[in-house]
Amino acid sequence: MSDKLIIFDTTLRDGEQSPGASMTREEKIRIARQLERLKVDVIEAGFAASSNGDFEAIRSIAQVVKDSTICSLARANDKDIARAAEALKPANSFRIHTFIATSALHMEKKLRMTPDEVYQQARLAVRFARQFTDDIEFSPEDGSRSDMDFLCRVLEGVIAEGATTINLPDTVGYAVPEGYAELIRSVRERIPNSDKAIWSVHCHNDLGMAVANSLAAVKMAGARQIECTINGLGERAGNTSLEEVVMAVKTRRDYFDLDIGVDTTQIVPASKLVSQITGFVVQPNKAVVGANAFAHASGIHQDGVLKARDTYEIMRAEDVGWSANKIVLGKLSGRNAFKQRLQELGIELESETEVNAAFTRFKELADQKAEIFDEDIVAIVSNEAQHDANEHFRFISLSQRSETGERPHARVVFSMDGQEQSGEGEGNGPVDATLHAIESRVSSGAEMVLYSVNAITGGTEAQGEVTVRLSKAGRIVNGVGTDPDIVAASAKAYLAALNKLHDKAVQKINPQI
């Protein structure tokens, strides 16, 4: 009988630590719901003690997600753990993930604690967490650089206190597959009560080996949980890619002999959603979810695939959620047909007000382009989801004037705290003029660090999706806007980013696990 491999998704916690990938509470809820449809086992929804925003996001996710275990990170102290437990209280099933550094460098320089003090604090933290749940994960931060004897002593102690999952992270992405697997195997063999816990891996991709390291630990060292993110999202070079480890284990079941509960048909929808919300574009040749993952340009390959797909395809595109663009609705389609298509796409809107707003935007788009695709509907919902009661800026309209040999001029009308504003500006091009027009009324002082345009579907009528990344006072935020008019999409994206900058969120604690 095969073992179960647990998929622990940390897109909303570790993935969000990518510069510019910060998400609003509503965006996190949308991703959490998609992760639930994906049937991941555990969703690490955030770090409750790091900010009030994280606390509220975790609590909201715990209220709406019912089929996945919801997890919060917590430092090894009573205050953090109690805060995590409070945020997780509404969940059907929840886990507390606590951690403390165990390397000599971290203990001396960061914690300013002796090894004995760290050992006692780790044990007491797990003991305290047991008051709230039996599902407790422990991570020794910088464990791969810790003294082996001390690391084993700490892990044996926390298992004795009731830790049910032990996670050994490759914090800085330095490990290689054989060495990482050997570390975990050695630790498990040296700890007499290692069989009382599930062993987990959490790898970073600095050397491009996060997936290989994770799979080596599973195959060679008995790890039975992989911590990963959608699209490999994460700071620096990212984390272990969920789609890659899942499809490796699924496709090579003959080698791994493990069961996995993920609904793989939801992988591509999850990838697209995370990319759209964060603005981190998926590279075309990315395994599983890249646009070219199932494309064959070679004539020999094309001929082989046409005759028998398994000649060059080791998995089917539809098995991971890829499908051809499909015309689903048009300008004559009614509200019920629109709601039905939302359900078929797995999109859940919380209220009739949200449905009405999305339907209104759909009808506006249908007047502009004849054919409405699934990707258009997803973009509509994503765009509407950015609007909330606390929204500071909102796009209303745009007019432009541009003639060859003259500097373009733009006039942008938008609301600021409910009051209509009108700004005018000139620039080197229509987009530059439009953003100058907005800044003429806002004076944000932000620096643009990224501007990118992507066509949502094919054809000249396609909606443009614009991503804008702004930096100010050490904060980096991301905004996305969609519209058949690229310049209007740019204005929407810029205002969306300004909304995030306007949110006076306190500085979050971002642990390196």
Swiss-Prot record:
Domain Pyruvate carboxyltransferase, residue spans: 5-268
Binding site for Mn(2+): D14, H202, H204, N239
Catalytic activity: 3-methyl-2-oxobutanoate + acetyl-CoA + H2O = (2S)-2-isopropylmalate + CoA + H(+)
Annotated spans, Regulatory domain: 394-513
Cofactor: Mn(2+)
Pathway involvement of the protein, from the record: Amino-acid biosynthesis; L-leucine biosynthesis; L-leucine from 3-methyl-2-oxobutanoate: step 1/4
InterPro entries: 2-IPM_HCS-like, 2-isopropylmalate_synth_dimer, AIPM/Hcit_synth_CS, Aldolase_TIM, LeuA/HCS_post-cat, LeuA_allosteric_dom_sf, LeuA_bact_synth, PYR_CT
Family (UniProt): Belongs to the alpha-IPM synthase/homocitrate synthase family. LeuA type 1 subfamily.
Record function comment: Catalyzes the condensation of the acetyl group of acetyl-CoA with 3-methyl-2-oxobutanoate (2-ketoisovalerate) to form 3-carboxy-3-hydroxy-4-methylpentanoate (2-isopropylmalate).
Designated name of the protein: 2-isopropylmalate synthase
